[in-house]
């Protein structure tokens, strides 16, 4: 039977698949729309397995906060190209993943992928992901998620660079007003910009400090001038350098990026806001995700990629 342009258009709108793929599906199923959708799903799942060898290092971080502000989630979903990361279908899918993660009881990403997909419980999250790979046309990966709950305060969220970075901040406080919320947002922006590894120096292990001291001592011993200095001077140098490093990697010790004097720490900024609002405020922790962080991107020759797609 003849396949009409209207049928192709309808199937394309239903599935988001390519025009030629839709035409092939309709031809193979003799114009049966439901069977054509299944045909594309099956074809898509097979294609998804093929695409899985390609590196998904771009993508999007999405945050979601409950209405009462007590609970929040951040997810990272990767794609192969920045172009797809800006695609509306991809962004909507990431929002759906965030909604799923908000309500999950999964302890890790593997358990999350194995649970039923809330929008279609006949599929698992992993199977729904494979279907999206077929529709969008690139390898994708739900890389990670994190939930933060704070009953005695609220959780602030912030996304930066169009979702390249997603941040959650756990704020314990007995006062929740606009000023305190603005403070939390400013702290989240600080985290996005300066990438702290810890909330405070109390979280840094003694093993980490000792390891850093050993490295610094080795550096000094390998320096002809510094190695000749008295032991007490060397000890003071190491202590000073450790202190400087902790100031860089611990959020509350960092210099607040908006400090008018260029010296005020994040801790002092939080203290000032607490005092001004008659509040007790503690920044208990944070989560910072950056898309593709730690993923090695695969570089391919563009001409070779085009030739590959053209079948040459």
Task: For each feature predicted by the language model, list its residue ranges.
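N-terminal assembly/interaction segments in proteins that build large macromolecular machines
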Residues: 2-312
């Amino acid at each position: 039977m003849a396949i009409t342009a209207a049928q192709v258009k309808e199937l394309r709108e239903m599935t988001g698949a390519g025009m030629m793929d839709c035409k092939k599906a309709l031809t193979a199923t003799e114009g049966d729309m439901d069977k054509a959708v299944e045909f594309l799903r099956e074809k898509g799942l097979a294609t998804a397995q093929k695409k899985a060898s390609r590196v998904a290092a771009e993508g999007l971080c999405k945050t979601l906060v409950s209405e009462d502000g007590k609970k929040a989630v951040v997810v990272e979903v990767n794609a192969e190209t920045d172009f797809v990361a800006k695609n509306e279908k991809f962004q909507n899918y990431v929002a759906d993943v965030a909604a799923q993660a908000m309500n999950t009881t999964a302890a890790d990403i593997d358990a999350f992928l194995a649970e039923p997909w809330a929008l279609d419980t006949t599929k698992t999250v992993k199977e729904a992901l494979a279907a999206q790979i077929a529709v969008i046309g690139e390898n994708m990966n739900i890389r990670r998620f994190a939930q933060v709950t704070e009953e005695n305060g609220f959780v602030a969220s912030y996304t930066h660079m169009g979702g390249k970075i997603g941040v959650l901040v756990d704020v314990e406080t007995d006062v929740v007003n606009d000023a305190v919320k603005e403070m939390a947002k400013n702290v989240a922006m600080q985290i996005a910009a300066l990438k702290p590894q810890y909330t405070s120096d109390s979280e840094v292990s003694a093993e980490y400090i000792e390891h850093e001291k050993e490295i610094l001592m080795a550096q000094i011993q390998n320096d002809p001038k510094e190695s000749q200095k008295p032991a007490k001077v060397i000890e003071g140098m190491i202590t000073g350098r450790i202190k400087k490093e902790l100031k860089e990697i611990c959020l509350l010790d960092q210099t607040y990026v908006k400090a008018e004097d260029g010296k005020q720490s994040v801790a002092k900024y939080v203290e000032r806001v607490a005092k001004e609002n008659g509040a007790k405020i503690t920044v208990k922790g944070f989560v910072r995700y950056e898309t593709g962080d730690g993923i090695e991107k695969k570089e391919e020759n563009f001409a070779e990629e085009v030739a590959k797609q053209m079948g040459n």
